[in-house]
Amino acid sequence: MNWINKDTEIYCSFAKNAGNTGCQMMNTAFYYYGLNKVYKSFSINDIGKAVDSVKTLNIKGFAITMPYKIDVLNYVDEVSNSVQDIGAANTVINNNGYLIPHNTDYLAAKQFLIDYVGDELYILGNGGYSKAVQSAAKSLNIDYQVITRDGWGSIQNIRHSTSYNCTPVENIKVSDTNKFIDCLVKTKTGKRLATMQASH
């Protein structure tokens, strides 16, 4: 059994409303591989102060979720071209006080979308996660349209296409003729995406 001690490395996630999925997945992996690491999720209201705490406490890395995936880029030390092109990050590595963001949402979305090439793609939402999906679609030459909340009523009129929910909205109704990808981790596709994202 692993015991937390003075040498335990800390990893975490920051969200408006923290969940347990990351804690369960990451701590299970740490335990399985006998790693002296622990993962904890935090609900926060100020991403800037949260990032400051990472440096103060020497937290080794952190995940970011809604609604901070875009804003976090204002508080890191370096932004790669790929992250800059996406305009959002979901993972930050602390390299001795130097914070470098990454976007594993993009990698998972690209891996997932390969199975859906050929369909017209509708991306629901335009936040940080949506930006990763948009970049993944572009990289695969998939034509897509973004539907924001103002156009929400049009979702039920979409036929013979793929809809990709990038919002926290649950139970979205789509036509039976559509494929539906939901990023919410409590859904079947959301669990697959979370596993793919964590593997990167």
Predicted regions mapped to residue ranges:
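Rossmann-fold NAD(P)-binding glycine/threonine-rich loop
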Residues: 171-200
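Hydrophobic anchor at the start of a short beta-strand
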Residues: 37-39, 121, 144
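Short amphipathic alpha-helix with an adjacent loop that forms part of the alpha/beta core around
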Residues: 51-55, 152-161, 174
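Short glycine-/small-residue-rich Rossmann-like dinucleotide-binding loops
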Residues: 67, 164-171, 184-185
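NAD(P)-binding Rossmann-fold cofactor-contacting core
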Residues: 124, 139-155
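Glycine-rich adenosine-cofactor-binding loop
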Residues: 101-107, 113-139
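Phosphate/diphosphate ligand-binding glycine-rich loop within oxidoreductases
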Residues: 2-116, 193-200
